[in-house]
Amino acid sequence: MATVFERVKKVSVEQLGAEEKDVVLTASFADDLGADSLDQVELIMALETEFGTPETKFEIPDTDAEKLKTVQAVVDYLKSKGIKDS
């Protein structure tokens, strides 16, 4: 059973090349994990893929994506959109 955090962590490690130990709830994608603006766009796209299904596309609007600066912000956002631990 994977939590929302564990899934976000997995995507962050894969997309950003971050060390697993560095992907903590308080981590900033830019400051702590070294993501530039392109990395952050690619991360959002990967999160949309991770949390969507073939039947239900999951989309994070640009206006929301701009606010997702930390791992905690992403986890909270996903949970607010009905994503649950699996």
UniProtKB/Swiss-Prot annotation:
| Annotated metabolic or biological route of this protein | Lipid metabolism; fatty acid biosynthesis
Specify where it is mainly localized: cytoplasm
For the keyword Isomerase, the answer is no
Taxonomically, the superkingdom here is Bacteria
**Subcellular localization(s) per the UniProt record:** Cytoplasm
Which Gene3D superfamilies does the entry mention? ACP-like (1.10.1200.10)
* Record PTM text: 4'-phosphopantetheine is transferred from CoA to a specific serine of apo-ACP by AcpS. This modification is essential for activity because fatty acids are bound in thioester linkage to the sulfhydryl of the prosthetic group.
HAMAP family attached to this UniProt entry: Acyl_carrier
Stored PROSITE patterns: CARRIER (PS50075), PHOSPHOPANTETHEINE (PS00012)
What organism is recorded for this protein? Dehalococcoides mccartyi (strain ATCC BAA-2100 / JCM 16839 / KCTC 5957 / BAV1)
> Lineage of the source organism?
Bacteria, Bacillati, Chloroflexota, Dehalococcoidia, Dehalococcoidales
Protein name (database record): Acyl carrier protein
Its biological purpose: Carrier of the growing fatty acid chain in fatty acid biosynthesis.
- Keyword set includes Cytoplasm: yes
List GO BP terms, alphabetically.
lipid A biosynthetic process
> Belongs to which family?
Belongs to the acyl carrier protein (ACP) family.
MF terms per GO, please? acyl binding; acyl carrier activity
Q: Which residues carry this modification: O-(pantetheine 4'-phosphoryl)serine?
A: S37
List residues of the Carrier domain. Answer: 2-82
